[in-house]
């Protein structure tokens, strides 16, 4: 497992950790100080290459963030830089490989843009092939004065891609041309949230018929019906993750591999919330537990669904939770 820091960062770079598949114990083996202020990262399917955005306002005198490509060597103990490219926007916060791993897409939060990079023969990155800037604003001028793309979410058809935009309260839809690396609008509709929710991240159910969206400002989860054939969506349900107004800063969202449970993290309240998923894809809150630290910015599940690993930003710690037979995490 590799983890990076976020603005304002206090660590030295990318940490490399191993998770014991039986006990869930984490062993951190290396800290690789080769990336300036690393934020979000992703790896190739074969785990031999790593891609990481640096959440920056400028780098080496050039406005905007960067994205770096590395070869993973010596069992993860060493990263060899293959290339570094400008993301053409400030505060890059998310990066994802396209399903064929020939393209990499990045979201620039403050830059209000999305960039597409070709993955070259050596698995490094070429300069951006496409950069699209969103326009508009939301209802809350403190947080939504302009567009703030926050994630890259491929649609189930592997042709379209959604970009959840906190500033616009919608998931912006594009068609992706995987031959040319271009994003275009083609008639598929954006998916709106509710005014002032601050859409952050989303996840599709395995069959593609339900979409779950975490909102940052409202700390709510929206459930949509979704038609993979034409991208049409309808809001079915909105679930609160916190009670009252304190600690209302939604963060990450994940579905259990079984599809039976959905998890959400909330910063400020510093909790992990578990929802049961019924046969219609609707949610019922099942449990909530402290994240084991402050500001659980992200978390993930092991591939077998046995453990949940939470990354607490302000307390600088990783916490492991074992998931019981009912889907509830326990430290």
Stretches found by the model and what they are:
Residues 27-33, 80-85, 130, 136-142, ...:
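A short beta-strand motif characteristic of beta-propeller blades
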Residues 85, 94-177, 192, 269, ...:
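Structural preference for solvent-exposed beta-strand-turn elements
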């Amino acid at each position: 497992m590799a983890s990076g820091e976020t603005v304002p960062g206090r660590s030295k770079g990318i940490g490399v950790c191993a998770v014991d598949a039986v006990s869930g114990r984490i062993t951190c083996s290396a800290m690789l100080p080769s990336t300036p202020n690393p934020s979000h990262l992703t790896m190739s399917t074969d785990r031999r290459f790593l891609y990481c955005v640096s959440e920056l306002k400028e780098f080496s005198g050039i406005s905007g963030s960067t994205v770096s490509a590395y070869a993973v060597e010596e069992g993860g103990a060493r990263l060899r830089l293959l290339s570094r490219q400008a993301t053409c926007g400030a505060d890059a916060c998310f990066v994802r490989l396209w399903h064929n791993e020939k393209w990499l897409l990045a979201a620039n939060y403050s830059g209000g843009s999305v960039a597409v990079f070709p993955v070259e023969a050596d698995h490094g990155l070429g300069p951006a092939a496409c950069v699209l800037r969103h326009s508009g604003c939301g209802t809350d001028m403190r947080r939504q004065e302009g567009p703030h793309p926050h994630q890259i979410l491929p649609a189930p058809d592997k042709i379209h891609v959604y970009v959840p935009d906190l500033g616009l309260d919608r998931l912006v839809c594009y068609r992706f041309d995987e031959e040319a690396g271009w994003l275009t609008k083609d008639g598929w509709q954006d998916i709106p949230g509710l005014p002032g929710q601050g859409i952050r991240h989303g996840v599709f159910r395995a069959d593609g018929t339900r979409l779950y969206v975490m909102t940052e400002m409202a700390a709510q989860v929206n459930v949509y019906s979704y038609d993979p054939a034409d991208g049409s969506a309808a809001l079915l349900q909105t679930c609160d993750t916190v009670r009252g107004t304190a600690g209302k800063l939604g963060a990450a969202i994940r579905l259990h591999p079984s599809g039976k449970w959905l998890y959400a993290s909330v910063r400020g309240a510093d909790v992990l919330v578990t929802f049961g998923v019924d046969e219609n894809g609707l949610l019922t809150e099942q449990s909530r537990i402290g994240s084991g630290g402050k500001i659980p910015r992200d978390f993930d599940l092991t591939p077998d669904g046995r453990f949940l690993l939470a990354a607490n930003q302000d307390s600088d710690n990783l916490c492991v939770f074992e998931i019981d037979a009912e889907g509830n995490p326990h430290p």
